[in-house]
Amino acid sequence: MGKTLAEKILSEKSGSDARAGDIVIAKTDFTFMHCTTGPLAVRQFQSSGFERLADARKVAVFLDHAAPTPNAEMANDHLFLRSFADKTGCLMHRVGDGICHQLVAESFASPGDVVLGADSHTTTGGALGAFSTGMGSSDIAIACALGKTWLRVP
C-alpha cells in the first residue's frame, strides 16, 4: 500500500521509512510564534539554556494577535519579542504586516515542508502540500533551537 502525504513528508524529513503511528525526529523548514504564544516560547528557549537559533532564516515572530496592544502587559510582550528577534536574527513581522497563518501560507510554506507554529491555524499550510501543525510553546522553543522536532506520524 502507498503512503499518505504526511508519511511521505515525514519519511523525507526524518530519513526513515515513516509510517502512521511511528515516532520520528524530523527536520523543520519553518517555525513561528505570535505575540500571545511567543513570550512563553521565548522564555522556554532561554530557560533551556539556548542562545542561538538553528537557522534564523527559518524562524519568525508575528506581532498580529494583540495589535494594537490593548494594555501595558501586551506592549511589554511586544518589546520582549522584538528584543528576541534582534538578538537572534529571526524574521520579525510587525503590527500591520498581517496575520501569521496567512503570511506563512503566502510566503513561507511550500509542498513537502515541515511547518510548525504556536498557533491553532498553522494547519493552513497543509493546503499547500506541507506537513503543517500547531504545537505548544515548549515544543516550538526546542524546534527553534534545534531545527528539528519529534512527531508521531498521523
Segments and roles (model prediction):
Residues M1-P154:
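Fe-S-dependent hydro-lyases/dehydratases of central metabolism
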